[in-house]
Amino acid sequence: MGIKKNSENEKIRKSVDEFYRKISQDEYRTEVSPEEVSTSLGYSTEMMEQLPKGTDLGLSCGNPLENFELKNRETLIDLGCGTGKDLFLTRIKYPDSGTLYGLDRLDEMILKAEKIRDMKKFKNIEFRQGTLTSMPFEPESMDKAISNCVINLEPEKQTVYNELYRILKNGGKFYISDIMLKKELPKEWKKSEKMHNTWVGGALLEEELKKVIKKAGFKNIIIIKDEVTDAYAEKWGYGLKIKEYIQRGMIMGEK
């Protein structure tokens, strides 16, 4: 059973990697632009105009920047940072905070993020290639963590939250935007690689997600629910009625 499960998880990860590699290389496009998705989620045009074209890939389902503040010298990690959009916007908003770290599975994403960082001369932003299930960071090294529509891509969510607990300092907080289920998905959706690639296939019900987070050791868990935007559903829904089954959540907790 364990071997079969691991095999299925690796199949999902491989499919996800291939899908996002295509996106990073601009080989996957839809009629809805990345900018339309971001604007629908509360990213202002003024904010996005401060970043080079191509930084925004339209991979967000929320806006964690609306929910946290960074004090001077506080460190922050973005789990599944992609090309670094949320980190760059955080640096613009908090120029005197500590080092910002981005973690992503794909070298292609890291290379693009580093290129943008160097082009815009952003200071104290470091990117590392690695997985959410084995984060290449020391214990209790981060004050805050964010993530934007990424953790649902990883089959072993308990391991992710365990790792997040490990790297956060005591009193550290996380702010995670992700997709949650309103009700159980159709079986064919759960088995669909493309639904896993776009956060739906791996989504959990709210109570299931809370159990995972509590088991990792977190406290003061708050989940703010909202409908997914029409732009998001149109871009990533494959023409299916995904809004009947999913919602977006702003998930917050403290170590």
Indicate where each model-derived feature is located.
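A short acidic, Gly/Pro-enriched loop at the edge of an enzyme's catalytic core
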Residues: T133-K144
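N-terminal auxiliary segments of SAM/dcSAM-dependent transferases
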Residues: M1-S38
